[in-house]
């Protein structure tokens, strides 16, 4: 029932109109690396793209798209996979890449996927529905590792207090439900005032990022987009929180000419020809009309880069400000 309800509910892609305007003209072959409910892919096809490759690691997203994807014939190809390997999914140089980061509305709305702290469901949070779940992490990670994850991936100042409460709670019984975890976190923090975010927001974000390795996926995906785009090809990335937005912002800054500025910590830094140009002076945020239509868009930011003909290369995740968890063992 939940799946059917989500399929009927119209999907509102965040910042679609400004994205299409920023990457115009839309033509040739595009890759939507976070296909989800297909809103960006449809928008690109209707705006003039000859072909769109839709990539998603969530098998449910691709299953739900099977009912309408055939309407576009061979103009839309769906691929099960991650956007960190988008260049291998493309098979040929691309005219554009779109990435809509984080958890999708579909995943949030389905309680059984375990992403929401407002709906009771199994503590899962796996986008691919494979591998270690959030329950596995919460019930087996050491208190120190949990605190590191909450602090570095969620910017949660009360990380140690929350980690201690989790360890104490799981000693009595395994934590297997989303609302159970949300209540443990909420008891560690002051009651929010009207209009403030739910106290479990940062903790759920952090655990989700850890379960899905979202930051390494993002860095590798940006590198893959650089390899896959032809000269003049567009990269458009929509972010939803400051940590991932910082990574995208620094990537585009460095790849558009910020490299080669050596310092006493990296005196051997070489200068490279810019791999991207930046058509936007700053990130685009939703306007009031979009926020009224889709309140979930409030934290969204759109950044765009245009590929040059300079050779692609590797990037240092630390140079992008990627949060790193100290390597001292999880268990």
Swiss-Prot record:
- Annotated EC: 2.1.1.199
What GO terms are given for molecular function? rRNA (cytosine-N4-)-methyltransferase activity
Q: Name one Pfam family in it.
A: Methyltransf_5
Quote the catalytic activity from the record: cytidine(1402) in 16S rRNA + S-adenosyl-L-methionine = N(4)-methylcytidine(1402) in 16S rRNA + S-adenosyl-L-homocysteine + H(+)
According to the UniProt record, one GO cellular component term is: cytoplasm
Enumerate the UniProt keywords alphabetically.
Answer: Cytoplasm, Methyltransferase, rRNA processing, S-adenosyl-L-methionine, Transferase
At which positions is S-adenosyl-L-methionine bound?
38-40, 56, 83, 100, 107
Q: Which InterPro entries match?
A: RsmH (IPR002903), SAM-dep_MeTrfase_MraW_recog (IPR023397), SAM-dependent_MTases_sf (IPR029063)
Q: Segment Disordered: which positions?
A: 289-331
Q: Which top EC class is named for this enzyme in its record?
A: transferase
Name the Gene Ontology biological process terms: rRNA base methylation
Q: Where in the cell is it found?
A: Cytoplasm
- Specify whether Cell wall biogenesis/degradation is a keyword of the entry: no
Record's function text: Specifically methylates the N4 position of cytidine in position 1402 (C1402) of 16S rRNA.
Family (UniProt): Belongs to the methyltransferase superfamily. RsmH family.
| Name of this chain's protein | Ribosomal RNA small subunit methyltransferase H
